[in-house]
A protein has these predicted regions:
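N-terminal pre-ligand scaffold of iron-sulfur
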Residues: 1-72, 87-88, 102-122
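Short beta-strand His + acidic residue motifs that chelate non-heme Fe in jelly-roll/DSBH
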Residues: 86-87, 95
Length: 122
């Protein structure tokens, strides 16, 4: 879906829930706090969580392959740069060099059969 735009910047991203099955993810661009950021949403057993695609340790995108954020067993999100592990439900570091840090969450709303991530103009 094409994001809604205010002043040329996407402020809302949405997708069909069916397009993000359990253990999978989707990337998007959104306007957040006066800048464009790449975000991603993950489906954890029917619960959806969204984060900025930025490792708090390495400062690089997390995906180890395009749009792949989960470890092979789908228990954690992982940073492809140095192998930091993050809890998908909270974004908190679960292991590796990210110790004490967490991913930056983005607000998620579920409406009918869609997931909606809302950005910010301020």
């Amino acid at each position: 879906m094409e994001p809604a735009r205010i002043d040329g910047a996407p402020t809302v991203w949405s997708a069909q829930l069916a397009d993000i099955p359990p253990g999978r993810s989707a990337k998007f661009q959104i306007h957040w706090q006066k800048r464009m950021v790449e975000g991603f949403v993950v489906n954890v057993e029917g619960r959806y969580f969204a984060y900025v695609n930025h490792c708090p340790h390495a400062g690089t995108p997390l995906d180890w392959w395009p749009n792949e954020f989960f470890t092979r067993d789908r228990r954690f999100l992982t940073c492809g740069t140095h192998g930091s592990l993050f809890e998908p439900e909270s974004g908190k570091c679960a292991g590796g060099p990210c110790n004490g840090r967490a991913l930056f969450p983005l607000p998620v709303q579920i409406t009918d059969d869609r997931i909606v991530v809302i950005g910010s103009n301020v």
